[in-house]
Amino acid sequence: MKETLYAHVRRGAPRRRDWRLWAAVSLVLAVTLVVLIPLLWSVHYQLRYRHFVQGLSESTLAAYRAECLIAERDGELSPVSGGCGYQIYRLAAGLTPGRWGKPPEEPAPVVLDYGDGSTLSFWEVPLRNKASATGLFLWYTDPEGKSDGFSSALLHLDGIQRLLDQDAARAAAP
């Protein structure tokens, strides 16, 4: 018999794979996914809201400086003071967004035009939660035409209408 390089190598029994290692790896992977998915969703949600507020802030500041904020209600246009525009901004920026989504099909009862191509529209919409039957849906369109909006149970259309009415009364007073 001719000796070869592999003549002295002896193969033992095949190794059995350790199931505990695979179980541990699977458990670590599952826990990582359970932690990461909600975390990433939360970060995305926060960044989306930050973008909304930042765009609205820039539009409010530009309209305040140029004194060009216009409200459209029931087809009528009326000027809005910078102070009222800032109050509406503070209300919108202070809201906790409920559900992000698309605006209702019907025309908005109140639309604020900031004069730079951006608008903020308001609708009273039914909500899915049981804490409040209706809430306010805000839809912001920035000067580039990008739009985003959400509903919130913390504010209603009557509150926005009241602010605009008070502002109009102040402007009309001698």
Predicted regions located by residue number:
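Function-determining sites in protein domains
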Residues: 2-174
